[in-house]
């Protein structure tokens, strides 16, 4: 007879988000509650031969106004070594750690 693994409790102590609605939990949540959409017309590359002309993209900028600036979350030298989604994960993870107030020394 197989025994079931013991259930472990998980506690969420911090949150972080990077979404098409903005960088950060507060910005995303506020815009979501206002009924805003992250879907926008694609204007960063030519879509004339693509059927879909809209997408949900991460809002880029200097980091002000809930825009995403990867340099705030990872050194440019390190960014060149990884796929872009890794910088997204680092952004959300750092926000969650800051929200939790957890800043390990090592």
Predicted regions and their residues:
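Conserved "HGTGT" condensation-loop signature of ketosynthase/thiolase-family condensing enzymes
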Residues: 1-106
